[in-house]
C-alpha cells in the first residue's frame, strides 16, 4: 500500500497534475516566509550600523538643503525689498533727492541686482553642491556677481569722497557739485567695474588655452590658477578702496570735531562781545584793551558784511536797476499820492530808516569807505525815470559810530572826505539828478556824520508845494535828529553793532546748526556703511589671498560662509540708512503704510524741525 503510494508519487504523470504543482508551491512559500521571519528577527536583535548611518545621512542631507534654501531665500527677499524701498523713497520724497543721496541710490541699484540674481544662484549652487545649469549661465552669474559687488564697493568709495570734500572744502566743492557731475561719477564706477571683472572672467580660459575648472563647478578660473592675478584683483577691489575710505573717514571725523570746537569758541566770543557793548561808555574803558578787542571784532564783522556795497541802501526804499547805458542806478521807491506819505518817504530816504527789521535798518547806514568802490557809485537818474522817484532831502547828519568804520576810514580821521558819483552819459543833461555823499570824520571821541546832498525838486509838484515840502522835510528831520540825540545814552550808539549783527548772527547760527546736523547725519551714515563693509568683506578677501598660495587648506564650509557674508553687506546697507537718517525712516514707514502720495508741506517742515 505504501509502496503503491510512493510509486504513484514518483509517477511522472502525477507530477504533471495540477494538485502536485499546488502542493509544491505551498511548500516553497512556507519555506520562504520562514526564512524572512528568521532574518527579520535576527536584524531586530542586532541592527546593521551601515543601514542606520545611510538613513540618518539621507535625512541630514535633506535637512541641510532645506535650511540653506530657506536662509538664502530669506536674505534674497530682504535684500531686494530693502534696496527697493531705498529707491522708492528717493522717488517719492523730494527732500531725499539730494546729490549725496544720488550715490546712495546708485548703491541700492547694485545691491538690488545682488539680491535678485547673485544670492538665489549662489543658494542653489550651495544647496545641491554642484552646478548643473550650464557653462553659459555660470559665466553670466559670475560676471553679474563680481560686477555688481565691485560697483557697490566703488559707490561706497564715491560716497566717502563726497563726504570728505563737502566737509573739508564746503565753499569750493558744494557749488560745483551738480547732478550731471554726480551721474557722471556714478557711471564711472560701473564702467571701472565692467573693465575690471567680466572681460577677464570670460576670456581667461582662452588666455591660458585650457579649461581647468572641474565638471560640476562654477568658479573664476584665474582665482585658482594664477595667485598673482588673484592678489592684484583683491587689492584693486577691496584693500585699496577700504584703505582710502578709512583715511577719508578719519579726516572727516577730525574736521567735524574741529568745526564743533571752533563754533563753540565763536559763540563764546559773540556772547562776550554783546556783554561788552552794553557796558557804560567811559573814556578809560574806550582806552582799555578789552574795548580795542571789541573794535577789532566789530570791524571784521563790518568788513565781511558790507564790503560789497558802496552806497547807503535802505530796504524797501532803494533798488538797483540797469539803465540803457549799462550803469547801475539806485532808484528810490515811488511815493504815494498823499503829502504825508511823501514826507515819510523823504524822511526814510534821508535818514536811512525803513519799516524793515533792525538788520535792514542797520544796513541802511552801513557804508564801505573804500575809495574805489565809493567813487564808482552811480546815482544818475534818467529823465524818463524821474516821475517814479522821491527826491533826496537836504543834507542831514546821520550819527554813525566811529568803531564801525573800516580801516580805510580810520586813515582819514580829523578831516572830511567828499565822495562824488561818477559822471554818466546823462550828466550832460541839466534835467539829470545827481547827489553826493559827505562823510565827516572828527576826533576820536566824537561821532562821524554822514550827509546827503541837497534835494532836487520833485517835478510833478508845483513850486509852492516843492518849497513847502522841502522845509517840512528839513524841520521834521531836525526834530527827528534832536529827539534821537536826546534819547540816546552816552553809549547808546554803541549798540548799533549789536543791532546790525544780531539778525545775521541768528541766521548764521541756524545755518551752521543745520550744516552741523547734516554733517553729523552724513558722518553717522558713512561710519555705519564703512563698518558694515569692512566686517562683511574682510573674511572673504583674506581667504582668497590665502588660497591663492596655499590651495585647498581652508575648509569648504568656511569659504562658503565668507562668500555669502559679502552678500549680507547688500542686505545691511538699507538698514544703515534707516538707522542713521530719520528722513529715510519716515519714508520707510510711509511705504509700509502704502502712503505714496506727497504729504502736506507743513507736516514735512515740522518733521524736519524736530529732527
Swiss-Prot record:
<dbReference type="GO" id="GO:0007197">
    <property type="term" value="P:adenylate cyclase-inhibiting G protein-coupled acetylcholine receptor signaling pathway"/>
</dbReference>
<feature type="disulfide bond">
    <location>
        <begin position="138"/>
        <end position="218"/>
    </location>
</feature>
<comment type="function">
    <text>The muscarinic acetylcholine receptor mediates various cellular responses, including inhibition of adenylate cyclase, breakdown of phosphoinositides and modulation of potassium channels through the action of G proteins. Primary transducing effect is Pi turnover. Enhances the release of the neurotransmitter acetlycholine in cholinergic motor neurons, which in turn positively feeds back to depolarize body wall muscles and allows for the maintenance of normal body posture and locomotion.</text>
</comment>
<dbReference type="Pfam" id="PF00001">
    <property type="entry name" value="7tm_1"/>
</dbReference>
<protein>
    <recommendedName>
        <fullName>Muscarinic acetylcholine receptor gar-3</fullName>
    </recommendedName>
</protein>
<feature type="topological domain" description="Cytoplasmic">
    <location>
        <begin position="579"/>
        <end position="611"/>
    </location>
</feature>
<dbReference type="GO" id="GO:0045202">
    <property type="term" value="C:synapse"/>
</dbReference>
<dbReference type="InterPro" id="IPR000995">
    <property type="entry name" value="Musac_Ach_rcpt"/>
</dbReference>
<dbReference type="GO" id="GO:0001508">
    <property type="term" value="P:action potential"/>
</dbReference>
<dbReference type="InterPro" id="IPR000276">
    <property type="entry name" value="GPCR_Rhodpsn"/>
</dbReference>
<dbReference type="GO" id="GO:0007187">
    <property type="term" value="P:G protein-coupled receptor signaling pathway, coupled to cyclic nucleotide second messenger"/>
</dbReference>
<feature type="region of interest" description="Disordered">
    <location>
        <begin position="500"/>
        <end position="519"/>
    </location>
</feature>
<feature type="topological domain" description="Extracellular">
    <location>
        <begin position="203"/>
        <end position="227"/>
    </location>
</feature>
<feature type="transmembrane region" description="Helical; Name=6">
    <location>
        <begin position="526"/>
        <end position="546"/>
    </location>
</feature>
<feature type="transmembrane region" description="Helical; Name=3">
    <location>
        <begin position="141"/>
        <end position="161"/>
    </location>
</feature>
<feature type="compositionally biased region" description="Basic and acidic residues">
    <location>
        <begin position="503"/>
        <end position="519"/>
    </location>
</feature>
<keyword id="KW-0297">G-protein coupled receptor</keyword>
<feature type="region of interest" description="Disordered">
    <location>
        <begin position="377"/>
        <end position="432"/>
    </location>
</feature>
<keyword id="KW-0472">Membrane</keyword>
<dbReference type="GO" id="GO:0016907">
    <property type="term" value="F:G protein-coupled acetylcholine receptor activity"/>
</dbReference>
<dbReference type="GO" id="GO:0014057">
    <property type="term" value="P:positive regulation of acetylcholine secretion, neurotransmission"/>
</dbReference>
<keyword id="KW-1133">Transmembrane helix</keyword>
<feature type="transmembrane region" description="Helical; Name=4">
    <location>
        <begin position="182"/>
        <end position="202"/>
    </location>
</feature>
<feature type="topological domain" description="Cytoplasmic">
    <location>
        <begin position="162"/>
        <end position="181"/>
    </location>
</feature>
<dbReference type="GO" id="GO:1902474">
    <property type="term" value="P:positive regulation of protein localization to synapse"/>
</dbReference>
<dbReference type="GO" id="GO:0007186">
    <property type="term" value="P:G protein-coupled receptor signaling pathway"/>
</dbReference>
<dbReference type="InterPro" id="IPR017452">
    <property type="entry name" value="GPCR_Rhodpsn_7TM"/>
</dbReference>
<feature type="transmembrane region" description="Helical; Name=1">
    <location>
        <begin position="68"/>
        <end position="88"/>
    </location>
</feature>
<dbReference type="GO" id="GO:0030425">
    <property type="term" value="C:dendrite"/>
</dbReference>
<feature type="compositionally biased region" description="Low complexity">
    <location>
        <begin position="307"/>
        <end position="317"/>
    </location>
</feature>
<keyword id="KW-0812">Transmembrane</keyword>
<dbReference type="GO" id="GO:0007268">
    <property type="term" value="P:chemical synaptic transmission"/>
</dbReference>
<keyword id="KW-0807">Transducer</keyword>
<dbReference type="GO" id="GO:0009410">
    <property type="term" value="P:response to xenobiotic stimulus"/>
</dbReference>
<feature type="region of interest" description="Disordered">
    <location>
        <begin position="299"/>
        <end position="364"/>
    </location>
</feature>
<feature type="topological domain" description="Extracellular">
    <location>
        <begin position="123"/>
        <end position="140"/>
    </location>
</feature>
<feature type="topological domain" description="Extracellular">
    <location>
        <begin position="547"/>
        <end position="557"/>
    </location>
</feature>
<feature type="transmembrane region" description="Helical; Name=2">
    <location>
        <begin position="102"/>
        <end position="122"/>
    </location>
</feature>
<feature type="topological domain" description="Extracellular">
    <location>
        <begin position="1"/>
        <end position="67"/>
    </location>
</feature>
<feature type="glycosylation site" description="N-linked (GlcNAc...) asparagine">
    <location>
        <position position="33"/>
    </location>
</feature>
<dbReference type="GO" id="GO:0043051">
    <property type="term" value="P:regulation of nematode pharyngeal pumping"/>
</dbReference>
<feature type="topological domain" description="Cytoplasmic">
    <location>
        <begin position="249"/>
        <end position="525"/>
    </location>
</feature>
Amino acid at each position: 500500500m505504501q509502496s503503491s503510494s510512493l510509486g504513484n508519487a514518483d509517477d511522472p504523470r502525477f507530477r504533471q497534475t495540477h494538485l502536485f504543482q499546488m502542493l509544491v508551491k505551498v511548500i516553497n512559500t512556507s519555506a520562504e516566509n520562514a526564512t524572512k521571519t528568521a532574518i527579520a528577527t535576527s536584524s531586530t536583535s542586532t541592527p546593521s550600523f551601515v543601514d542606520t548611518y545611510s538613513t540618518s545621512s539621507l535625512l541630514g542631507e535633506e535637512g541641510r538643503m532645506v535650511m540653506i534654501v530657506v536662509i538664502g531665500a530669506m536674505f534674497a527677499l530682504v535684500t531686494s525689498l530693502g534696496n527697493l524701498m531705498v529707491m522708492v523713497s528717493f522717488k517719492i520724497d523730494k527732500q531725499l533727492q539730494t546729490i549725496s543721496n544720488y550715490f546712495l541710490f546708485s548703491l541700492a541699484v547694485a545691491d538690488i541686482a545682488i539680491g535678485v540674481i547673485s544670492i538665489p544662484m549662489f543658494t542653489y549652487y550651495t544647496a545641491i553642491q554642484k552646478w548643473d545649469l550650464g557653462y553659459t549661465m555660470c559665466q553670466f552669474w559670475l560676471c553679474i556677481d563680481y560686477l555688481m559687488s565691485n560697483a557697490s564697493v566703488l559707490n561706497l568709495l564715491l560716497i566717502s569722497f563726497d563726504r570728505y570734500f563737502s566737509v573739508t572744502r564746503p565753499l569750493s566743492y558744494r557749488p560745483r557739485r551738480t547732478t550731471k557731475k554726480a551721474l557722471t561719477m556714478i557711471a564711472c564706477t560701473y564702467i571701472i567695474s565692467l573693465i575690471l571683472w567680466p572681460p577677464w572672467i570670460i576670456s581667461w580660459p582662452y588666455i591660458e588655452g585650457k579649461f581647468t575648472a572641474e565638471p560640476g563647478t562654477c568658479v573664476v578660473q584665474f582665482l585658482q590658477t594664477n595667485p598673482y592675478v588673484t592678489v592684484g584683483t583683491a587689492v584693486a577691489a577691496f584693500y585699496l578702496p577700504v584703505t582710502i575710505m578709512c583715511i577719508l573717514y578719519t579726516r572727516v571725523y577730525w574736521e567735524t570735531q574741529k568745526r564743533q570746537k571752533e563754533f563753540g569758541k565763536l559763540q563764546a566770543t559773540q556772547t562776550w562781545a554783546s556783554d561788552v557793548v552794553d557796558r557804560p561808555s567811559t573814556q578809560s574803558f574806550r582806552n582799555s584793551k578789552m574795548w580795542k578787542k571789541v573794535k577789532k571784532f566789530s570791524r571784521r564783522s563790518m568788513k565781511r558784511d558790507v564790503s560789497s556795497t558802496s552806497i547807503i541802501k535802505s530796504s524797501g526804499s532803494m533798488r538797483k536797476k540797469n539803465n540803457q547805458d549799462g550803469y547801475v542806478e539806485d532808484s528810490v521807491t515811488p511815493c504815494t499820492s498823499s503829502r504825508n506819505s511823501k514826507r515819510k518817504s523823504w524822511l526814510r530816504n534821508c535818514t536811512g530808516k525803513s519799516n524793515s527789521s533792525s538788520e535792514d535798518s542797520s544796513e541802511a547806514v552801513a557804508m564801505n569807505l573804500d575809495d574805489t568802490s565809493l567813487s564808482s557809485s552811480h546815482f544818475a537818474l534818467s529823465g524818463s525815470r524821474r516821475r517814479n522817484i522821491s527826491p533826496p532831502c537836504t543834507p542831514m547828519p546821520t550819527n554813525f559810530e566811529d568803531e564801525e568804520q573800516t580801516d580805510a576810514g580810520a586813515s582819514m580821521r580829523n578831516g572830511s572826505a567828499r565822495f562824488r558819483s561818477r559822471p554818466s552819459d546823462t550828466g550832460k543833461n541839466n534835467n539829470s539828478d545827481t547827489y553826493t555823499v559827505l562823510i565827516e570824520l572828527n576826533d576820536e571821541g566824537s561821532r562821524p556824520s554822514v550827509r546827503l546832498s541837497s534835494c532836487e525838486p520833485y517835478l510833478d509838484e508845483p513850486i509852492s508845494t516843492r518849497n513847502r515840502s522841502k522845509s517840512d522835510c528839513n524841520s521834521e528831520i531836525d526834530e527827528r535828529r534832536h529827539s534821537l540825540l536826546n534819547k540816546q545814552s552816552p553809549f547808546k550808539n554803541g549798540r548799533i553793532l549789536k543791532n546790525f549783527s544780531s539778525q545775521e548772527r541768528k541766521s548764521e547760527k541756524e545755518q551752521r546748526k543745520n550744516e552741523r546736523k547734516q554733517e553729523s547725519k552724513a558722518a553717522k551714515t558713512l561710519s555705519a556703511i564703512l563698518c558694515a563693509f569692512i566686517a562683511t568683506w574682510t573674511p572673504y578677501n583674506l581667504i582668497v589671498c590665502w588660497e591663492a598660495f596655499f590651495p585647498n587648506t581652508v575648509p569648504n564650509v568656511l569659504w562658503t560662509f565668507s562668500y555669502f557674508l559679502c552678500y549680507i553687506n547688500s542686505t545691511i546697507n538699507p538698514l544703515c540708512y534707516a538707522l542713521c537718517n530719520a528722513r529715510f525712516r519716515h519714508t520707510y514707514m510711509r511705504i509700509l503704510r502704502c502712503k505714496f502720495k506727497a504729504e502736506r508741506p507743513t507736516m514735512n517742515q515740522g518733521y524736519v524741525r524736530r529732527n
